[in-house]
Design a protein with these regions (language model features):
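Early extracytoplasmic/lumenal segment of secretory-pathway proteins
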Residues: 26-103
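Bacterial N-terminal signal peptides that target proteins for export
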Residues: 1-9
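Conserved C-terminal helix/tail region of periplasmic/extracytoplasmic solute-binding proteins
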Residues: 382-476
Length: 476
């Protein structure tokens, strides 16, 4: 059922994209327009206008950013793949980047010509991206002869783990995924409604128990990172069935599957543990502190997911030059810091400026070795990166990262995984509810299209007035 809903939403999204491409008035100054498609609440919005000014300073050309947001990777992909939407810059997750590369939906970013252009102006900020992040991106599957780093540039990253209430759960308990199956916590557990982020760590946990039971691992031994990486590709019928059996056990204890409200449930102590992303965990921990609730976050010892979102230039992009400048602009350290401030997530940019920004001996008692992350382009660690006082939730130590792996696109097995996820959650919508969902998304998307067009025209009119005023001043 969930697969069907995703398909319906994707179809409506593709239709909306087609409407936008075909609407009159938008293409008049398309070459001076940059269409950006990003996750909601995932940028310092002041940077959008600042980019317009910076781009004109660097190139002598004007550009207007049309900024739109999405909440589901698959909806974004459907607009591009099926609707041929002409977004210039998009920010998908790692597994969608894999799929877009496989389906030849991406254009290269750092071309030799563009690199020479920005080097000549001394504004090449791509080197500020951590070599560790680039290494992780290189692990993404790509067609033979293609390097994922040529087609994607990292933006934000983090881990998947357990947020817990320290009053009811100890750190030792939270260091294992077994906590998710603790009957003592019945109706106090929330789980992120993101099947990939749940499937992978539970599979790692289940396989760990299997190998311990068979004697392949000792009682306290963990899987190797190589095995964990292999499991990130595993969507076999056997593994799907194994994860389903574990999730059905866990479901008996779960109070809810949450898309965003889990943070509030934790701060209000209506939930005691929540399987969630590190960025959301930091927000919840800070909010809880303000109301006297102590929350903490761990990445269980059995292993988990390290995730990445990155910038890409889709196949149907029009303004590729401005797109490349925009991605470069987002890699500028001061802009990366502002985006971290605005979103609560962690930028892939890791130079001396960022290291200084995140360091605070006053706020943190234990120094972390982040020399794996804060590295110069030549591979040498940045001075002081081996002893950093900072938030371990946002910046996990090497020991934590060494038990985390990147998720991969499951291709045509995705439907099987979605069907399993629906069975676990008990999705069972009536025809009437389905029709309601279809109508809701149709209306919202069409209204969104109309609103974007109207806003675009208003901004175009404002731009023309500004130009007229400028020309008038120049004459007088």
């Amino acid at each position: 059922m969930q697969r069907y809903i995703y398909n319906v939403i994707a179809l409506v999204a593709a239709c909306a994209a087609t409407l936008m491409v075909g609407c009159g008035g938008i293409s008049d100054e398309r070459t001076h327009t940059l269409k950006v498609y990003n996750w909601g609440d995932y940028i310092d919005e002041d940077l959008i206008a600042e980019f317009e000014e910076w781009y004109e300073e660097q190139t002598g050309e004007s550009v207007m950013v049309v900024y739109q947001t999405f909440d589901i990777n698959e909806v974004m992909l459907a607009k591009i793949e099926n609707g041929h939407a002409d977004f210039d810059v998009v920010c998908p997750s790692e597994y969608i980047i894999e799929r877009m590369m496989r389906n030849e939906l991406l254009q290269p970013i750092l071309t030799p010509e563009f690199e020479a252009e920005i080097n000549a102006k001394d504004i090449n900020y791509f080197d500020c991206v951590s070599p560790y992040i680039k290494e992780q991106f290189s692990l993404l599957e790509a067609p033979e002869g293609q390097n994922p780093n040529d087609y994607s540039v990292g933006y934000m990253w983090g881990t998947t783990g357990i947020l817990y209430n320290a009053k009811y759960v100890s750190e030792e308990e939270a260091m294992s995924w077994s906590l998710m199956f603790d009957e003592r916590l019945q109706d106090k557990i929330f789980v992120k409604d993101a099947f990939r982020d749940v499937y992978s760590p539970i599979l790692v946990y289940a396989k760990t128990l299997e190998k311990r039971a068979s004697g392949e691992l000792g009682e306290d031994e963990m899987l190797s990172i190589e095995t964990i990486r292999e499991l990130m590709y595993d969507s076999s019928d056997e593994s799907i069935a194994l994860v389903e059996s574990y999730l059905k056990r866990m479901k008996e204890l779960v109070a809810g599957w949450e898309a965003d409200f889990g943070k509030e449930m934790m701060t209000q102590e209506k939930a005691w543990i929540n399987l969630m992303w590190s960025g959301d965990a930091v927000w919840a921990i800070e909010e809880a502190t303000n109301v006297g609730v102590e929350l903490a976050y761990t990445v269980p010892e059995e292993g988990s997911v390290v995730w990445f979102d990155g910038w890409v230039i889709p196949k149907y992009a029009v303004n590729t030059r401005a797109a490349r400048y925009f991605i470069n602009f987002m890699c500028k350290p001061e802009n990366a810091i502002r985006n971290m401030d605005a979103t609560g997530y962690v930028s892939v940019v890791t130079n001396e400026e960022v290291l200084d920004y995140i360091s605070s001996e006053e706020d943190y008692d234990e120094a972390l070795d982040l020399s794996y992350l804060f590295v110069h382009a030549d591979g040498t660690p940045i001075e002081g990166s081996d002893s950093v006082f900072t938030d371990p939730v946002l910046y996990p130590s090497r020991s934590v990262i060494d038990r985390c792996a990147v998720m991969h696109d499951s291709g045509d097995r995705t439907d099987k995984m979605l069907e399993m996820w629906s069975r676990v959650k008990g999705d069972n919508l009536s025809t009437g509810m389905l029709v309601g969902i279809i109508l809701f998304f149709s209306v919202m998307l069409v209204l969104g299209v109309a609103r974007k067009i109207n806003n675009y025209r208003k901004r175009q009119a404002h731009r023309k007035r500004r130009r007229h005023q400028f020309e008038h001043k120049a004459k007088h």
